[in-house]
Amino acid sequence: MVDNSEMIFGVRAVIEAIQAGKDIDKILVKKDIQSDLSKELFAVLKGTLIPVQRVPVERINRITRKNHQGVVAFISSVTYQKTEDLVPFLFEQGKNPLFVMLDGITDVRNFGAIARTCECAAVDAVIIPAKNSVTVNADAMKTSAGALHTLPVCREHSLKETLQYLKNSGFRIVAATEKGDYDYDKADYTGPMCIIMGAEDKGVSYDNLALCDEWVKIPMLGTIESLNVSVAAGILIYEAVKQRNN
């Protein structure tokens, strides 16, 4: 069973939570749901960034014994922000923004560890996609050692569009990839910057790589082919810190 304080049960209750602007990580809906109220739910969901998964009712029953009516919403542990709101705010404050974007990272522990590093390095925000991404729940909060209480998290419909917006706003984009042209410490991290990290199995998607200004790699000197993504992120983040403080 999951902590019930992190969930909302029932179609009407979930509709009201969405309309009230609650930050919701995802919604599980039983596959064969067919009611007027469920149609209202899907209408309300249009235009939101909330991922919806259609699942067997048995899966929902394993999560809770409450009267869920085939619908369970998982409440986010953070209040999501929008990149397009945060960027002008940071520039108005005279900041030299540093963002970290996570492309396809779904492991809560990796996400929490990256968030912790970001907070320690004074990164201005972490950007994640609305779909195929981590669930920012209590486990993520715990793994981050509380960093997610203060670190802004932006959840975006399209990372590609967000990258284009950042480039138009004067950001340089650096991707960590095994296809990198040169080692990570040869890149320029001094200006407005977004570092993009991909999942360990797939890496940064091709569409997103195509928008990056620099592709960098971390040299592997042993027999293992790659680092854990949270470790790799930490290396690039602190290279940025070093260059910005020199």
Task: Walk through the language-model features, giving the residues of each.
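Glycine- and other small-residue-rich loops at beta-strand/loop junctions that grip anionic moieties
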Residues: 6, 30, 103-104, 129, ...
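Structured adenosyl-cofactor binding patch, chiefly the S-adenosyl-L-methionine
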Residues: 15, 20, 142-147, 206-246
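RNA substrate-binding interface of SAM-dependent RNA methyltransferases
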Residues: 16-23, 34, 88-182
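N-terminal positively charged helical leader segments and presequences
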Residues: 1-89
